[in-house]
């Protein structure tokens, strides 16, 4: 989006509540107009999706966003394409050829084409930022998305009666086991 701050204020009045892929394919913060990105800092109704891979949004901008919104208004996402977890090489996204390297997916033009980010890697990057705690990661990766899409009554936290979708991770946030509705869906070998 190229929305200006005034446009974002109007959009919020019309019901907009989320910025998709914050900082990507949108105007940046400028000293004459803070645009869509800056609107997250001033409009408490908004939440922002972040692709925390250090490529779509660099560490300094991730830190700036966290410092100005806290974990309550950030939703961690991956925007991962189907080549996530596969070897570097040539793939396709929406009929377009995509080149996947060790850390990114891009079109021949060099434009980013989704990501190959795994959520645990994004969580580790966020946790490495100043002031971010494990409780913040849980909120940004689980609680906030579940609330935003209206499924918090059964997803997003560990409570009696919920679906028992759980991750078992080590101290470095590497996934060891995944449970879906109480059943083991993945277990590290």
For each of these PLM feature ranges, what is it?
Residues 1-2, 53-56:
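Glycine-rich beta-to-alpha transition loops that act as phosphate-gripper elements at the mouths
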Residues 1-34, 85, 182:
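Histidine/acidic-residue-rich, glycine-tolerant segments that coordinate divalent metal ions
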Residues 6-13, 63-72:
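Short amphipathic alpha-helices and their capping/turn segments at secondary-structure boundaries
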Residues 6-8, 36, 61, 156:
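Short acidic active-site motifs
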Residues 23, 81, 172:
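Anionic group-transfer/hydrolysis microenvironments
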Residues 32-50, 54, 66-78, 83-168:
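His/Asp/Glu-enriched, well-ordered alpha-helical/loop segment
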């Amino acid at each position: 989006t190229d929305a200006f701050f005034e446009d974002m204020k109007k959009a919020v009045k019309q019901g907009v509540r989320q910025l998709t892929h914050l900082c990507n394919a949108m105007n940046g913060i400028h000293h004459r107009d803070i645009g869509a990105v800056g609107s997250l800092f001033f409009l408490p109704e908004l939440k922002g999706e972040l692709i925390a891979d250090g490529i779509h949004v660099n560490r300094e901008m991730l830190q700036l966003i966290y410092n100005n919104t806290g974990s309550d208004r950030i939703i961690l996402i991956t925007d991962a394409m189907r080549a996530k977890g596969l070897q570097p090489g040539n793939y396709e996204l929406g009929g377009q050829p995509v080149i996947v390297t060790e850390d990114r997916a891009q079109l021949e033009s060099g434009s980013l084409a989704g990501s190959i980010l795994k959520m645990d890697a994004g969580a580790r990057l966020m946790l490495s930022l100043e002031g971010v705690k494990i409780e913040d990661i849980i909120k940004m990766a689980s609680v906030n998305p579940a609330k935003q899409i209206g499924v918090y009554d059964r997803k997003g936290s560990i409570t009696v009666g919920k679906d028992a979708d759980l991750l078992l991770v080590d101290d470095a946030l590497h996934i060891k086991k995944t449970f879906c509705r109480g059943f083991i869906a993945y277990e590290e070998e």
